[in-house]
C-alpha cells in the first residue's frame, strides 16, 4: 500500500483559467482540511455553470478558509458554503473583512436578480425554474464569519495548520498566504500586484519554501512600465478624444480598486484643468460602498495626494436604479459602471444604449476573460447580444492596459525569484494556458532542475518537505468543455448577424435554401 502524503492540495478552481480560485489543503488520514480562497467562476455562461455544479469537496470537511482578498473570483462562492450549512471561520485581513460586507451582499443580490431575469425571458418559457446560486442573506452570513488578522503575524486557522499573511500589492487588503502544516512550508500568492502600483505597497513574501503556488494571469505579457504621471497622460488623451465626439465615455470597471484608481486620476486631471469639466457618474452602488471602505483605510493607502475620493463635487454616485436608467438619455459624460467584464450589473444597459451610438466611446481598463462580453467587444464583434437583445457595435472601442492590478511576466518572475530556494515545486495557477506555459518556460530556462506543476481543475497533488509535488488524482474530465472558447458567445454573435447575412443573399428562394441547409446541419449534429 502506498503511504499517504503528509499534506495534499486539490485545485477546485483557477487551474488553466483565471477565475474560481479555490485550493483545498488536507492533512493525512483523519486530519483537518482548509481552503485557500473559495471564488466564483466568471466569464462565459458555460464557465459560470461550474458555480452550480459539484464543489469537489464536502463543506463539512472544511475547518476554515484562508482568504487572500475580496475579489469575487476569490471569495464569491463563500455564500454558497453558508447556504449549505457551513459556518466558518474565514481568516483574512481587516480591509478584506470590511469589503466582504458589501462585496458578498452585492453578489447575492446579483444572483437573485439574474435568476429573476432568466425566468422572465421569453426564450426560457417552459424551462425548469432557474434558482439563484445563493442570496443576499447568505452573502451577509459569510461576511459575519470573517475573522480579521494582522499582516505578518502567525495565526492558527485550524488545528494542525499555521498561517501568516503577507502584502500582495494587488488591491486593498490583498495578501499572500504562507501556510505550514505536516512539516510542509507553502506559499499561495493570491493575486500579485505590479511594481509601483497606485494605492498599494509592493508585494512581499518569505523565502526558502517547499512549494510556491503562483498566479500567472499575465504570464505571457510584459508591459511597458510607465509612471503614474504617464498613465494619467494616456487617460487624459482618451477622455479628450471621447468627449470631442459629443458622446459618452463609458468605462466598464471593477467596483473594487479599479474604480478608485480611475477616480483619483480623473479628479487629479480635473483639478489641474487638463480635461473638460464634465460630470463623472459612478453607476455602481457596490463601487460607491467600496469607495467608502477605501476612505476609511486611507492611512494604509499610497498616492492619494490629499484627494478624498468619497467626497468630490465632480463625482456623482448613482444609487437609485431609476437614476441609472436616466443616464441613457444624456451625452457628454463619463460613466463608470460595473461589472468590469460586462457580464452583469448596470454596465450592460449602458452598453446596450451606447454601443449603437457612433459618437460614444467604450474604454476598457481591465482584464477581459475568454468568453466574457467584454472580450467579445474588444475582439471586434460587429454585433453583440445583451439581455436577449441584438446590439450593433458602432461606438469607438478603446483600451488602456496600464491599470492592471496584476503583475506582468517580468514582475511575476521577479516575485518567484525572491521566494528562492523553492525546494519542492513551483505550481502555476490562476492563468489561461498560454500565460502558464510562457511563465513556466521562462522559469525553467532559469532553473532547469526546478519542478514546475501546471495543475488542472480537480487534480490533487501530494506534498512532502523538500520533495516535488506528486499527482495523486487526475482532473475532472466533465468540466473540460467549459474551459476556453464558449459556444454561447459564438451563438450570440451568429444570431446577431444572421438576419443581415440572409438579407445579402439574392432571392427569396436562395435564402430559403440557406435556411434549410442550416436546419439539416443542426439535425445531423443531433444524431
Give names to the regions the model predicted.
Residues 107-171, 298-330:
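Metallo-beta-lactamase
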Residues 63-64, 87-89, 248, 278-279, ...:
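Short active-site oxyanion
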Residues 172, 176, 195-282, 361-363, ...:
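Cap/insert and terminal regions of metallo-dependent hydrolase folds
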Residues 15-20, 27-144, 192-202, 231, ...:
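Pre-active-site segment of Zn-dependent metallo-hydrolases
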Amino acid at each position: 500500500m502506498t503511504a499517504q502524503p503528509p499534506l495534499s492540495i486539490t485545485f477546485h478552481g483557477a487551474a488553466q483559467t483565471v477565475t474560481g480560485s479555490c485550493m483545498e489543503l488536507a492533512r493525512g488520514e483523519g486530519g483537518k482540511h482548509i481552503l485557500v480562497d473559495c471564488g466564483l467562476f466568471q466569464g462565459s455562461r458555460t464557465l459560470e455553470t461550474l458555480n452550480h455544479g459539484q464543489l469537489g469537496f464536502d463543506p463539512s470537511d472544511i475547518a476554515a478558509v484562508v482568504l487572500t482578498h475580496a475579489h469575487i473570483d476569490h471569495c464569491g462562492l463563500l455564500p454558497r458554503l453558508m447556504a449549505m450549512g457551513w459556518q466558518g471561520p474565514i481568516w483574512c485581513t481587516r480591509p478584506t473583512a470590511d469589503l466582504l460586507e458589501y462585496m458578498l451582499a452585492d453578489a447575492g443580490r446579483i444572483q437573485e436578480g439574474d435568476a429573476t431575469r432568466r425566468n422572465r425571458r421569453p426564450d426560457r418559457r417552459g424551462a425548469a425554474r432557474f434558482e439563484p446560486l445563493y442570496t443576499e442573506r447568505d452573502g451577509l452570513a459569510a461576511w459575519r464569519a470573517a475573522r480579521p488578522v494582522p499582516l505578518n503575524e502567525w495565526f492558527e486557522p485550524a488545528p494542525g495548520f499555521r498561517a501568516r499573511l503577507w502584502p500582495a500589492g494587488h488591491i486593498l487588503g490583498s495578501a499572500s498566504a504562507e501556510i505550514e502544516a505536516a512539516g510542509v512550508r507553502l506559499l499561495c500568492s493570491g493575486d500579485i500586484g505590479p511594481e509601483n502600483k497606485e494605492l498599494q505597497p509592493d508585494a512581499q513574501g518569505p523565502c526558502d519554501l517547499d512549494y510556491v503556488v503562483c498566479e500567472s494571469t499575465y504570464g505571457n505579457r510584459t508591459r511597458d512600465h510607465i509612471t503614474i504621471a504617464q498613465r494619467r497622460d494616456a487617460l487624459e488623451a482618451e477622455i479628450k478624444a471621447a468627449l470631442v465626439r459629443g458622446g459618452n465615455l463609458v468605462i466598464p470597471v471593477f467596483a473594487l480598486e479599479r474604480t478608485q484608481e480611475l477616480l483619483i486620476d480623473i479628479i487629479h486631471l480635473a483639478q489641474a484643468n487638463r480635461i473638460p469639466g464634465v460630470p463623472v457618474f459612478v453607476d455602481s452602488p457596490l463601487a460607491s460602498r467600496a469607495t467608502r471602505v477605501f476612505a476609511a483605510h486611507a492611512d494604509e493607502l499610497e498616492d492619494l495626494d490629499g484627494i478624498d475620493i468619497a467626497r468630490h463635487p465632480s463625482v456623482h454616485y448613482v444609487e437609485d436604479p431609476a437614476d441609472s436608467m436616466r443616464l441613457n438619455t444624456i451625452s457628454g459624460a463619463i460613466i463608470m459602471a460595473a461589472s468590469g467584464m460586462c457580464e452583469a450589473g448596470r454596465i450592460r444597459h449602458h452598453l446596450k444604449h451606447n454601443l449603437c451610438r457612433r459618437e460614444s466611446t467604450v474604454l476598457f481598463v481591465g482584464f477581459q476573460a475568454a468568453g466574457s462580453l467584454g472580450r467579445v467587444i474588444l475582439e471586434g464583434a460587429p454585433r453583440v447580444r445583451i439581455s436577449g437583445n441584438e446590439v450593433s457595435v458602432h461606438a469607438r472601442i478603446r483600451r488602456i492596459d496600464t491599470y492592471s492590478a496584476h503583475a506582468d511576466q517580468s514582475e511575476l518572475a521577479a516575485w518567484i525569484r525572491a521566494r528562492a530556494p523553492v525546494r519542492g515545486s513551483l505550481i502555476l495557477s490562476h492563468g489561461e494556458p498560454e500565460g502558464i506555459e510562457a511563465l513556466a518556460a521562462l522559469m525553467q530556462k532559469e532553473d532547469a532542475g526546478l519542478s514546475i506543476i501546471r495543475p488542472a481543475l480537480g487534480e490533487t497533488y501530494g506534498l512532502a518537505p523538500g520533495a516535488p509535488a506528486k499527482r495523486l488524482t487526475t482532473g475532472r474530465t466533465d468540466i473540460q468543455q467549459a474551459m476556453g472558447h464558449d459556444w454561447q458567445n459564438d451563438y450570440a454573435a451568429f444570431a446577431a448577424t444572421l438576419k443581415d447575412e440572409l438579407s445579402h443573399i439574392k432571392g427569396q428562394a436562395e435564402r430559403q435554401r440557406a435556411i434549410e441547409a442550416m436546419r439539416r446541419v443542426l439535425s445531423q449534429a443531433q444524431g
